[in-house]
């Protein structure tokens, strides 16, 4: 009876190794897919906001007794530092996603702890830039009567819509980086057991 149990152990051990190997390959495929999606989303967010500009002819009244003068006014992404920060942080996150994708494909074992820290830095950077861009976007959409900032999105509708799309894409990209942090942390935790 004991000889039968000992004989079946190597077979079970080999089967368990194959199951564990296939689970780690699945996690690796998931990791690669999330990195590719994060790369695409942050690249799209940087491009959508980076090409965002709109010019409108706006009537400007200088003196109440004179008629308004129609002047062309432009809204461009680089006029506001929050949007510049958003484009730069999405470009950095996109570049990092490409680099981490290459590192993940290469299969180096000792870099997982570095990758998780860098993923977490990307999450923090993207969330901070999204918050800054969203705050300025809301100022453009709603204005602020306390400091006499008027809303501008009723004039520059396409510009504001592109800002909203860029922020949404960037938020999705940052959520993917957050998922990568969680998945990598769980994988490292399982390996340490």
Swiss-Prot record:
Its main location: membrane. Pfam families: CASP_dom. It comes from the Eukaryota. Residues 52-86, 135-162 are extracellular. Residues 1-30, 108-113, 184-193 are cytoplasmic. It is a multi-pass membrane protein. One of its GO terms (cellular component) is plasma membrane. The chain crosses the membrane at residues 31-51, 87-107, 114-134, 163-183. InterPro entries: CASP/CASPL, CASP_dom, CASPL. It is found in: Cell membrane. The keyword DNA-binding does not apply. The keyword Flavoprotein does not apply. Keywords: Cell membrane, Membrane, Transmembrane, Transmembrane helix. Belongs to the Casparian strip membrane proteins (CASP) family. Homodimer and heterodimers. PANTHER family: CASP-LIKE PROTEIN 1U1. This is CASP-like protein 1E1. It comes from Populus trichocarpa (Western balsam poplar).
């Amino acid at each position: 009876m004991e000889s039968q149990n000992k004989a079946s152990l190597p077979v079970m051990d080999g089967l368990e190794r194959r199951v564990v190997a296939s689970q780690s390959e699945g996690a690796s495929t998931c990791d690669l897919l999330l990195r590719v999606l994060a790369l695409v989303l942050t690249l799209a967010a940087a491009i959508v906001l980076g090409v965002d500009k709109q010019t409108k002819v706006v009537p400007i009244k200088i003196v109440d007794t004179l008629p308004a003068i129609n002047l062309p006014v432009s809204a461009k992404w680089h006029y506001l530092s929050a949007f510049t920060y958003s484009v730069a942080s999405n470009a950095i996150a996109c570049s990092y996603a490409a680099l981490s994708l290459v590192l993940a494909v290469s299969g180096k074992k000792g870099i997982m702890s570095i990758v998780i820290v860098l993923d977490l830095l990307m999450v923090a950077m993207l969330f901070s830039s999204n918050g800054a861009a969203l705050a300025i976007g809301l100022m453009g959409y709603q204005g602020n009567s306390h400091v006499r900032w008027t809303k501008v999105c009723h004039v520059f509708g396409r510009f504001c819509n592109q800002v909203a799309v860029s922020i949404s894409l960037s938020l999705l990209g940052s959520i993917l980086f957050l998922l990568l942090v969680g998945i990598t942390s769980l994988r490292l935790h399982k390996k340490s057991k």
